[in-house]
């Protein structure tokens, strides 16, 4: 069975966000942590913690979503773009602007995961993993 960690974390964040759940858990991986670092730096989540799981080999990620006092999320949407069956690669000049710059695109480059704004500034392209707005 093949497993897509990007689809897993995006689906879990979307489902928890729609249900107004503040905390969620998932198995940890380096890719998931890199995605969460970007979401944290851009202000879309409150934080995350990594716990060692005694029963299993994988560590556990506890993700804290960000809501205001009226239970309105700071994350309006997150969508997977590049999928295992259809990878989407773009050059630095063709990096997409999400909602005319109001959102971000998460791009996997040869220098690691970064936002579309940072990749455009460094003039490097890569695989567009997700749109966040």
Curated annotation (Swiss-Prot):
In the record, biological process GO terms are: translation
Which UniProt keywords are listed? Answer: Ribonucleoprotein, Ribosomal protein, RNA-binding, rRNA-binding
Spell out the PROSITE patterns in the cross-references. Answer: RIBOSOMAL_S8
Record's GO cellular component terms: ribonucleoprotein complex; ribosome
Described purpose of this protein according to its UniProt entry: One of the primary rRNA binding proteins, it binds directly to 16S rRNA central domain where it helps coordinate assembly of the platform of the 30S subunit.
* PANTHER family to which the protein is assigned, alphabetical: 40S RIBOSOMAL PROTEIN S15A
- Quaternary state and interactors: Part of the 30S ribosomal subunit. Contacts proteins S5 and S12.
Q: Which family does it belong to?
A: Belongs to the universal ribosomal protein uS8 family.
What is the protein's given name?
A: Small ribosomal subunit protein uS8
Q: Which organism is it from?
A: Mycoplasmoides gallisepticum (strain R(low / passage 15 / clone 2))
């Amino acid at each position: 069975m093949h497993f897509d960690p990007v689809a897993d974390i995006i689906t879990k964040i979307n489902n928890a966000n729609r249900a107004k759940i503040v905390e969620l858990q998932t198995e940890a991986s380096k890719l998931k942590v890199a995605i969460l670092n970007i979401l944290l730096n851009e202000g879309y989540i409150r934080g995350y913690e990594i716990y060692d799981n005694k029963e299993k080999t994988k560590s556990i990620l506890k993700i804290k979503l960000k809501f205001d006092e009226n239970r309105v999320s700071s994350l309006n949407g997150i969508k997977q773009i590049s999928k295992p069956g259809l990878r989407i690669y773009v050059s630095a000049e063709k990096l997409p602007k999400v909602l005319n710059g109001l959102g971000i695109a998460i791009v996997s480059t040869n220098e690691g995961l970064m936002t579309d704004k940072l990749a455009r500034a460094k003039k490097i392209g890569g695989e567009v993993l997700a749109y966040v707005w």
